[in-house]
């Protein structure tokens, strides 16, 4: 019997996959547990529609990420932050991902999740720093951060 997997089933199939499985296994386990549906015309058409919607959503998210990348890579996009520092240019404290994200939002209206920034450790010195950003699968950029001394 052909079934459409509604969830990943270890050793049998993955979500959205159409496979031939033994009739008893399909009827008595997969379908009863809600792990799969029978692969009839209606269910196959539904699967195609769902896949098309997911692909369109994926493309829309990727396009949005490309747009944000274009904004981040513009020359005028430099996040200006102020912090107290000593005479040796070392900060009293540090600049975290959260502060960079807040600066991006306030100064440029770019909203990002702080987990997209790949800041290995907080910024602890004055000056310019390039912070890598992973916007989407295969879409990466850098945010330029300029830390100046607070009076």
Curated annotation (Swiss-Prot):
> Does Hydrolase show up as a keyword for this record?
no
Q: InterPro entries annotated for this entry?
A: Ribosomal_bL9, Ribosomal_bL9/RNase_H1_N, Ribosomal_bL9_bac/chp, Ribosomal_bL9_C, Ribosomal_bL9_C_sf, Ribosomal_bL9_N, Ribosomal_bL9_N_sf
Which cellular component terms (GO) are annotated to the entry? ribonucleoprotein complex; ribosome
Q: Name one GO molecular function term.
A: structural constituent of ribosome
BP-aspect Gene Ontology terms: translation
Do the record's keywords include Ribosomal protein?
yes
Name the UniProt key words of this record, in alphabetical order.
Ribonucleoprotein, Ribosomal protein, RNA-binding, rRNA-binding
**PANTHER family given for it?**
50S RIBOSOMAL PROTEIN L9
What this protein is reported to do is described as:
Binds to the 23S rRNA.
Q: Which HAMAP family match?
A: Ribosomal_bL9
UniProt record similarity statement: Belongs to the bacterial ribosomal protein bL9 family.
Name of this chain's protein: Large ribosomal subunit protein bL9
Lineage summary? Bacteria, Bacillati, Bacillota, Bacilli, Lactobacillales
Query: What's the name of its gene?
Result: rplI
């Amino acid at each position: 019997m052909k079934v459409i997997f509604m969830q990943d089933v270890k050793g049998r199939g993955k979500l959205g996959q159409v496979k031939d499985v033994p009739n008893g296994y399909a009827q008595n386990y997969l379908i009863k547990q809600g792990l799969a549906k029978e692969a009839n015309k209606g269910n196959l058409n539904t699967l195609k529609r769902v896949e098309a919607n997911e692909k369109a959503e994926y493309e829309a998210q990727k396009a949005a990420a490309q747009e944000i990348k274009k904004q981040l890579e513009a020359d005028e996009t430099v996040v200006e932050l102020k912090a107290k520092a000593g005479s040796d240019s070392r900060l009293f404290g540090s600049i975290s991902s959260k502060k960079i994200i807040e600066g991006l939002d306030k100064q440029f209206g770019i909203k990002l999740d702080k987990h997209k920034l790949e800041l290995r450790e907080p910024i602890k010195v004055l000056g310019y720093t390039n912070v890598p950003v992973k916007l989407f699968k295969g879409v990466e950029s850098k945010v330029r951060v300029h830390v100046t001394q607070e009076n």
